[in-house]
Design a protein with these regions (language model features):
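The feature captures the beta-strand-to-loop junction immediately N-terminal to the Walker
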Residues: 12-14
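Helix-to-loop junction immediately C-terminal to a conserved catalytic motif
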Residues: 27
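Conserved ABC transporter NBD signature motif
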Residues: 35-48, 57
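Conserved ABC ATPase "signature" region
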Residues: 81, 85, 92-110
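Catalytic Walker B motif of ABC-type/P-loop ATPase nucleotide-binding domains
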Residues: 139-142
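ABC transporter nucleotide-binding domain
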Residues: 157-248
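C-terminal coupling/interaction segments
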Residues: 248-285
Length: 285
C-alpha cells in the first residue's frame, strides 16, 4: 500500500473487518500471527531493529486510538513531554515540538490543565497532539470522533485538515460516511481482512449507481422478491433489516420501477450515497 504525502485516507468496513487490527499491526503495536514480511516506512517490523533505528522509526509514525492514551493527573504539556522522553526526542527540540503540536490541535490555551478536567472532545485533540509530538510523517487515527457531539467532532476535523496542510499523511478508520466525504482524498474498503476497494469517495459512491430503491417487503415474500429482482432484472440487493414481519431491502441497478409496481411493493427512490456502497460491498445478498 502506497500513501501519498499529505493524503487523508479513510479505512472503512463492517465491524470486525479488521480495521483496528490493521492499524495496530502496521503501527508496530501488534505482531501478526501469519506474515513473512511487514515493511512500514522502510523497516521490516518482523525483524529486530537496533535500538537507535527503532527510536528513529517510532518518531516517524503517530497513533491515536479512540480510547484515551493520556495520563489524567498530568497536564496537557506534561503528557506531551512524557511522549518526547519515551520516544527519544532530543531535549533541545522538545519545547518546539510540544508547542507546535498543541497549536496544530488547538489546545495550547489548555497546556497547564490536568487532562482529567478536560471535555471528551478536548481530550481527543490532546490525544492527537500526543501522537504528533514526535513530528511523524504518517499518523493513524482510529475512529477519532467516536462518541463526540457534532461540535466537538468538527473541532477534530479542523485538526485533521491542519495536519494535512502541514504535509502529514493521515490514515483514519471511521464508520461516519460524512467524514469520508468531507475529509478524505481516498477510501480503502476492508472486509474480512482484505481490501475490497481502493478509490476516491466519489468513485466509490458511483459503485452503487445513480439511483437506489429502498423497499419494504413482507418477510414471507422476501426470497421470492429478491429472486425476481436478481433473475429478471439483474439487480443487486442488500437486506438491511429483518424484524420478522417486514424486511428493509436496498435494490441497486434498476432502470425503472415497473417490476416493483407490478409486485405491489412499497418503495422509495433516491440518489445513491456513499453509505449505499458501504452496504453493497459489506452486505450484498
Amino acid at each position: 500500500m502506497t500513501l501519498e504525502t499529505g493524503q487523508v485516507v479513510a479505512l472503512i468496513g463492517p465491524n470486525g473487518a479488521g480495521k483496528t487490527t490493521l492499524l495496530r499491526i502496521i503501527s508496530g503495536l501488534w505482531v501478526p500471527t501469519q506474515a513473512q514480511r511487514l515493511e512500514v516506512l522502510g523497516a521490516d517490523l518482523l525483524k529486530p531493529l537496533p535500538r537507535k533505528k527503532s527510536k528513529q522509526w517510532s518518531q516517524q509514525l503517530g497513533f491515536a486510538s479512540n480510547s484515551s492514551q493520556l495520563f489524567g493527573l498530568l497536564t496537557v504539556r506534561e503528557n506531551l513531554e512524557y511522549v518526547c522522553r519515551l520516544y527519544g526526542v532530543h531535549k533541545a527540540q522538545r519545547a518546539e515540538r510540544i508547542n507546535r503540536s498543541m497549536e496544530l490541535c488547538n489546545v495550547a490555551d489548555r497546556s497547564g490543565d490536568q487532562v482529567w478536567t478536560l471535555s471528551t472532545g478536548l481530550k481527543q485533540r490532546v490525544n492527537i497532539a500526543r501522537a504528533m509530538v514526535t513530528n511523524p510523517k504518517l499518523i493513524f487515527l482510529d475512529e477519532p470522533t467516536s462518541g463526540l457531539d457534532p461540535l466537538a467532532a468538527n473541532d477534530v476535523y479542523g485538526v485533521i485538515r491542519r495536519l494535512q496542510n502541514s504535509g502529514v499523511t493521515v490514515l483514519l478508520s471511521t464508520h461516519i460516511m460524512t467524514e469520508v466525504n468531507d475529509l478524505c482524498d481516498r477510501v480503502l474498503f476492508l472486509s474480512k481482512g482484505r481490501i475490497m476497494a481502493d478509490a476516491s469517495p466519489e468513485q466509490l459512491r458511483m459503485r452503487a449507481g445513480e439511483v437506489v430503491y429502498q423497499l419494504q417487503v413482507p418477510t414471507s415474500q422476501k426470497q421470492s422478491v429478491i429472486t425476481r429482482l436478481n433473475d429478471e432484472l439483474g439487480a443487486r440487493t442488500v437486506i438491511r433489516q429483518d424484524d420478522g414481519v417486514e424486511v428493509d431491502v436496498l435494490a441497486f441497478g434498476l432502470s425503472n420501477s415497473n417490476l416493483l409496481d407490478q409486485m405491489g411493493l412499497t418503495y422509495t427512490r433516491r440518489d445513491a450515497q456513499l453509505a449505499d456502497t458501504f452496504w453493497l460491498l459489506g452486505g450484498a445478498e
